[in-house]
C-alpha cells in the first residue's frame, strides 16, 4: 500500500489543488440511494467531499456541505438481506416500504440509511443531511419539475445526442406514484398540460416490477412523483445552487450519467454544472461493491473495526483519481496503522502549514486523539494473544508518567480494533502462540541466525528496559554478529512464536519475562565453522569497507580467533583435527557511536596432526601485516586485544 498523503508534488494537498481557483461561497453536495446495507466504498465520496469542505473552512471560505438521501427512488432489486416478503414492494418508493420486522426505523430507506448516518457522527463528517421525500413533498422541486416537463423534447434530444439513448416521442422525464397501486418504478408519463401529467402504470415497463395497468392524470407536484435521477441530479444543482459535487468514475464517462445531467443543466436551466471531482473505485480485496446486491463489506462493519481517524486516513490519504484497494489481511492492516502512526509521530509542532499537519487536520476527529504516542497495532495483536497479560495495565506500567486519559481512550479504541480483527479477520496463519519450548522449526535457521540468538542470550541486559532500548540492543547485536536485520528478526520470531513475522522485536522483549528470553536464546547452538563461513568477508571486502567509512571511524580494536574441528567422538587431547580456520574480528566504533564487527577470513588449514599454537602464531604474524594495511588505508591505529583465542569444536 503506497503512501499518497501528499497527493501532488509541492506544498498543496490534493484537496487544496481542487479548491485553489475557487472564489465566493461554496455549496458541496453528495448523495446515496439506501437500496440495501451501505457498503464501505460509499464512504469514499462522503470523505472526499468532507476533506474539501474542511479545506474550504480552513481557508476561511463560506461553505455548506449537503448530503442527500435519495429515498424516493424505487426498490428495483431485493436487498441481499431482504426478506422474501419485500417482493410485493418492488417498484415502490423506498421511503414508502415498511421497515423490516424488529427494526426501529420508520421505513425501509430509513432502516438502511440510519446505520450509515451513524458513522457520519463518529467520523465528524460536517454534512447537513436532507431526504428527497421531504424535498419533493414540500414542493421545493415544483419549479424545476415544471420547467423540465415543459422542455421534455429538449431532454429527449439530450438523451439521444449525449448518451445515444432513444426515448419515444411522447416520453416525459417524470415518474408518478401510481394512485392505484403505489408503485413509482412502473409508471410512464406521456403528456403534461402545465398542471397535470398523463401516465400509465405498465405491466411490462421494467423486468423487476409489474405495474397494475392503471391509467390516469395527476399533478406532478408536492411529492406525487419524482424526476429520473439524471434530471433529479440537474434539479438539485439548480435548486440548491450546488458548486462542487464529485462522482465515481463510472458516472463520469463520456455520455454517462454525469455528462447527461450537465447537458440538461445547461440546456434547460442555463446554469453551469458544479465543479466535478471524479474518483476511482474503492475495492475490497480487488472487488467492486454494490449496496443493493450486498456485494462487499458493510460500512458499519469496517467502522466497528477501524478507529475513526484511521478510517478517515484510509479514505482521504489517496488522491481521488487513484483506486483504493482495501484489505483486512494482516500485512495491509498493520501497514495502514503503521503509516498513520508515522504521520502522527512525525508532525513538526512548529510548522503549521506542513503537509503532514494538513493531512492530520483533515483526518482527525478530535485534535487530542492525535496528540499522543500510539501503541503499535501489530504489538497489540500479539499482546492480546499472549497468556497472563493484562494488556492495558502492562502498557500503562511501561509508559513514562503513565497513561493520560486521552492515551487510555486511544488505547481502548486500538485494543477494540485489534480484538475485532482477531475475532473476524485473522487467519490461522496470522495467529501467534508463545512457544513453551524451542519449536522444531528452529533447526531450519542458518548458523548465522543461531549465532545471533546465542549472542542475544549472552548479552541480554539486566533489569527492565523500554521498547526502544531493547530495539537498540537487538540492532547492536545484529552488527556484532554480523547479520542482516531481516534475518535477525525472523530468527527471533521463529524461536519465540514459530512464525516468520511478529511485532516489533524490542516491544516483544519489553513484555516477556527476561529469564525466559535468556533461557530460550542461550539454548541455541551453532556450528562455528558454518557461522564463520556465512558471516566472514574477504580481505579485499574488508579494505573496501574501511575505504568507504574512512573519516567516520572513532575507535578500532581487533582479536585473532582460531577454530579447529575435532573428529566425532575424538578427545581434544589427542590433537587430531580434520581442519580449521583462522579469522580476525575487527570491532569498529563509528562517529555515530554504533559498533560494527567485521570477521575477516585469513587462513585455512587441514591435516591429521596440526599444531594449533603454530597456526595461531602464523595467523598473528600474517594478521598483523594485514592490519597495518588497514591502518594505512583508513589513517587509524588498531589495538590488538590479547593473544589468539583457540576454539575446538566437535564435528
Where are the model-predicted features located?
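A structural motif corresponding to the C-terminal end of an alpha-helix
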Residues: 59-61, 115-128
